[in-house]
Amino acid sequence: RLLRSLMNVRFPGPALNGYMELQDELLTEEAQEKGLVKVEELPTAAEEFGIGQVRNADRMSLWRGDITRLQADAIVNAANSQLLGCFVPCHGCIDNAIHSAAGIQLRNACAELMEEQGHEEPTGKAKITPGYNLPAAHVIHTVGPIVGLKVTEKQKEELKSCYVSCLKLAEKEGLKNIVFCCISTGEFHFPNKLAAEIAVDTADRFLTGSKLERVVFNVFKEEDYNIYKKLFKKALL
């Protein structure tokens, strides 16, 4: 926890000689202890729940657990507009978990992207970096909408744009699979059920005509698992 806290508060920049090797060794060991989960070995939603309204359920999966265990071509990080990860020590957000498991190289890579861009990351776009010490080869970063008292139509479109941007980027990079976290539902307060509906519908439409082989929806809470499960089990009218 001490190392994670120090990583979380550390600003981007070069590390002391020997640090990277020690950090990488420790994070690799931690990843092995947590246990790796291969995306291609996950059952499809069609196998688990049958084929209902989701046409491409045979190319989607639902998995509950720690996203930093997944061996995938890319996992999606629900980032903030600075794109530098969470600076709160040991915070429970997905941004913190992914940066902590990847190592300080991820923040450094994001800082380079942001310096090159010259402004904050807009909502609904996507950027890609290596995964560094994660089992995932890449991290795709996207900034979801922040909801106030009520979800607006603009925010619904922005969330949809997050998914489309990530899917397009994955396809452009020649990736075969992508793992989505629940974008905007945590710290950004997007209603869970509506967010899941947008996620599944957007991915389903995109997969028709796409070369992507698998889209995985990763959830951590039982509430979210049940929401996605109901969407996949929803029968055709």
Kindly give the residue locations of the regions a language model identified.
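Macrodomain-like recognition of ADP-ribose-binding/processing modules
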Residues: 1-237
